[in-house]
């Protein structure tokens, strides 16, 4: 997104869920659309749906497509909501299909094994349209789907590469090379791989849009994504991250370890009922001095009692239960010292309220 905007394109991005405001889901050049445009899109959908029942996500997907068409976006960046094969976003024919990785998540919908989940994600691969997989470990179902659909599949560390030495990194595509890349010190493997994936997708669609080393480093120097290892400096250092499964926790751990100087962390945690509590917590536990568990304002949230019991049964003794999110945020603020590190993680539904609360403090 940043690269395309830097090159002068008008870029529409559709992502989900939102953190604070619904409009965040539909952005033009990284700015959420205003209420009037969003309402006009919904009115248009209502005028033509003729009694067809639409889900919450289908409404927002159609609103995004209408908006991007009306404002004549040069590039559409569309994030799948869940899986891929049956997702509402999968009604368009893309210029390229990107799959970042496959991890155990949303098993009640996508399947209980990595290969089952891979099959659902492979559903976004379109016939005779190039596709990319951003992990060196290629699932058989993704490879097979690409073959069946005659999609030219590009795989990280097979068809494009990113490598680093002490001073900088280098990306190598099919024809192009970008060297002297200054990767942010707090990035984890996920961000590193996603950069390689983004550059490869641009080369495949239009190589003239690839940035120079100088242009890329300028972007990376100021790069941030709301709610993804977002650091907010107040009296304490607050770190907001929407990681919610063990795979994402591994990446979060790498990023926490990169912070200097090393400090133990106070972690405020909440997770949805379909998430693996212990699988998530055990990845981070030795970095955390004190766990605060709380319940989110959604019926899908684990109860605070369940979270506390799971952590204690696992062998974690320093666990405090808070009845609500705002109480947790306020109490941690009042009982930690200047420059202490506070991590808020486990879901969009805890990070969003935390961001809103911190902005009001």
Question: What do the predicted segments below correspond to?
Answer:
Residues 34-38, 162-180:
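Acidic-glycine-rich active-site phosphate/pyrophosphate-binding loop
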Residues 2-9, 68, 284, 311:
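Hydrophobic alpha-helical packing residues
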Residues 14, 132-135, 147-166, 185-189, ...:
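Beta-strand->loop->alpha-helix junctions that form or flank phosphate-binding loops
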Residues 132, 136-141, 145-154, 165, ...:
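C-terminal helical cap/extension that packs against the catalytic core
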Residues 347:
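Active-site-proximal loop/hinge segments that shape catalytic or ion-binding/gating pockets
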Residues 6-92, 108-110:
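ATP-dependent carboxylate-amine ligase catalytic core
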Residues 84-86, 92-151, 277:
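Conserved catalytic-core segment of NTP-binding enzymes
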Residues 70-80, 87-98, 102-106, 116, ...:
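Nucleotide phosphate-binding/pyrophosphate-handling subdomain across enzymes
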